[in-house]
Regions:
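Mature-chain termini and adjacent capping regions
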Residues: 1-126
Length: 126
């Protein structure tokens, strides 16, 4: 991955944490695809390599876009969690949810909603 920010500051309370503003992250996968993530704020743990993105999070992957208010990539626990007003737009359809939880090692996705367990989805079936 490559992690960039317009501004970055060491956390005075913990030197392992770097607070960032206007963050861009690029995750490169073995199949030559790239996930790009942008947020207004972020925190990087230079010991565990974990990343937190917050405020107007936007992501793009192979023509799909995602927006939310929070995203957490845990390198140490092998998961990616997207939360708070999650919206996904794709050529195959779109949906909104409260939280997405990707278990990277199991390659599973859990979609959660606080609206009586329901998500709003429109799927294009051909």
């Amino acid at each position: 991955y490559i992690l960039k920010a317009k501004e970055a500051f060491n956390d005075p309370n913990d030197p392992n944490f770097i607070k960032m503003k206007n963050v861009n992250a690029f995750f490169y996968f073995k199949d030559d695809t790239v996930l790009e993530v942008f947020s207004e704020k972020g925190i990087y743990n230079n010991k565990t390599l974990d990343m937190n993105f917050s405020k107007n999070v936007k992501a793009a992957y192979e023509g799909s876009t995602l927006t939310s208010q929070k995203a957490e990539y845990s390198n140490s626990n092998n998961f990616l969690q997207i939360s708070e007003n999650v919206k996904v737009d794709d050529i195959r359809g779109n949906f909104t949810a409260e939280k997405l939880y990707f278990d990277i090692s199991k390659q599973t996705l859990n979609i959660a909603s606080s609206k009586k367990g329901k998500i709003n989805a429109n799927i294009n079936i051909k």
